[in-house]
Each structure stands twice: as structure tokens, then as C-alpha cells.
């Protein structure tokens, strides 16, 4: 979990901005979206191979 300490003279807005940036860098939201619904291993393999195919084509 990302943690941000608010300084004495720091506004709450800037602390919130730093927190959001840390969460984005840590990939918290991406991980949340990925785990929102269960994916069976076969579906995961299929998505992975399709992504590799798309990367290879470009």
C-alpha cells in the first residue's frame, strides 16, 4: 500500500496528488482492474498469446 506523509506546511491537495502519483507508479489501479473478475487460466493464456501476436505484428 502506498503511503504519503503530509508535511506541516503542505496542503491536502498536494498530498493527495502525491498519493495518486505513487499509486499509479505502483500499478495499484491496474492490478485492481485486472483482478476485478476471475479469469480462468485458459483465458489468461489466450489473452497473453493474443497480446504477443499484436506486439509481433507491429
Swiss-Prot record:
> What InterPro entries would the database entry show?
Ribosomal_bS21, Ribosomal_bS21_sf
The record's similarity note reads: Belongs to the bacterial ribosomal protein bS21 family.
Would I find Ribosomal protein among this entry's keywords? Answer: yes
Gene name, per UniProt, is rpsU
Bias class Basic residues marks the residues at 43-58
Q: Which domain of life is it from?
A: Bacteria
- Residue ranges, annotated region (Disordered): 34-58
Query: Is Ribosomal protein tagged as a keyword?
Result: yes
Listed GO cellular component terms?
A: ribonucleoprotein complex; ribosome
> From what organism does this protein derive?
Caldicellulosiruptor saccharolyticus (strain ATCC 43494 / DSM 8903 / Tp8T 6331)
- Keyword annotations of the record: Ribonucleoprotein, Ribosomal protein
* Gene Ontology terms for molecular function: structural constituent of ribosome
Protein name (database record): Small ribosomal subunit protein bS21
Which NCBIfam families does the UniProt record give?
Answer: S21p (TIGR00030)
Pfam family for this entry, one: Ribosomal_S21
Biological processes, Gene Ontology terms = translation
- What lineage does UniProt assign to this protein's organism? Bacteria, Bacillati, Bacillota, Bacillota incertae sedis, Caldicellulosiruptorales
Amino acid at each position: 500500500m502506498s503511503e504519503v506523509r503530509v508535511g506541516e506546511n503542505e496542503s491536502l491537495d498536494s498530498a493527495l496528488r502525491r498519493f495518486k502519483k505513487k499509486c499509479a507508479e505502483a500499478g495499484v489501479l491496474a492490478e485492481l482492474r485486472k483482478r476485478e473478475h476471475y479469469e480462468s487460466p485458459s483465458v489468461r493464456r489466450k489473452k497473453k498469446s493474443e497480446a504477443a501476436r499484436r506486439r509481433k505484428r507491429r
